[in-house]
């Protein structure tokens, strides 16, 4: 008997565990949100610092381990860029011939997609004149590989959401927030640690929630 278990990057709560934050503190923060109470200043400041760290590190085990061992942003960035290079090698190795360049183009367009106030994925951002028929298979490949996830718009916000989704109206996010950060300009991570989100605030928090 075999059971298939899907593995995902660490979420923020799991990242807190990895950083030695106990359940008492986490439960206290949860209680504040559930009861609509103000989080104590000291805890709020610590949680915001950890959230910024989570944004730049993400939840991939190799990157989290690097962060815990070194606390060095440059080392973290190098590990993430190596992982991105491995993703791109897999695109060449495992994708069908016609899709190979399209997959990489779709993947590399994600920061630009999220930086704009678009309500859905724009194929013209991937390449001028780009069409759904040209790239939809590439997006599916990236999703099947666990590199990205799609979030669909809905006609109405009622359950079942999937039944009310608009299949040709979606946005694409990286499965791991740290990978998105590593795709941005070098130095962005150091700025985020200082609390300076620059022009990426919308993209960062959209991707976090996705």
Q: Whereabouts are the PLM-identified features?
A:
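Conserved AAA+ ATPase "sensor/coupling" helix adjacent to the nucleotide-binding pocket
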Residues: 1, 18-31
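A generic structural signal for short hydrophobic patches within well-formed alpha-helices
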Residues: 12-15, 179-180
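Short secondary-structure boundary/capping segments
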Residues: 4, 43, 163-164
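Conserved AAA+ ATPase small/helical "lid" subdomain
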Residues: 28-77
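Hydrophobic/aromatic beta-strand patches that form the interior of the parallel beta-sheet core
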Residues: 3-5, 55, 173
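A short helix-turn-beta junction within AAA+ P-loop NTPase domains corresponding to the substrate/partner-engaging
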Residues: 1-13
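Accessory nucleic acid-recognition modules appended to NTPase machines
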Residues: 60, 64-210
């Amino acid at each position: 008997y075999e059971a298939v278990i899907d593995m995902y990057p660490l979420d923020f709560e799991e990242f807190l565990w990895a950083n030695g934050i106990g359940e008492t503190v986490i439960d206290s923060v949860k209680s504040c949100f559930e009861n609509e109470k103000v989080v104590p200043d000291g805890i709020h400041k610590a949680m915001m610092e950890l959230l910024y760290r989570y944004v730049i590190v993400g939840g991939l085990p190799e990157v989290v381990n690097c962060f815990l061992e070194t606390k060095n942003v440059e080392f973290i960035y190098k590990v993430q860029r190596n992982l991105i290079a491995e993703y791109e090698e897999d695109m060449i190795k495992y994708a069908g011939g016609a899709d190979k360049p399209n997959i990489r183009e779709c993947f590399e367009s994600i920061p630009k997609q999220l930086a704009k106030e678009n309500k859905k994925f724009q194929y013209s951002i991937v390449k001028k004149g780009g069409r759904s028929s040209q790239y939809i298979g590439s997006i599916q490949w990236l999703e099947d590989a666990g590199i990205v996830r799609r979030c669909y718009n809905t006609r109405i916000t009622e359950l079942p959401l999937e039944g009310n989704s608009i299949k040709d109206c979606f946005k694409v996010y990286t499965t791991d927030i740290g990978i998105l950060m590593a795709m941005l300009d070098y130095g962005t991570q150091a700025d985020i640690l200082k609390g300076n989100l620059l022009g990426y605030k919308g993209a960062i928090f959209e991707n976090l929630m996705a």
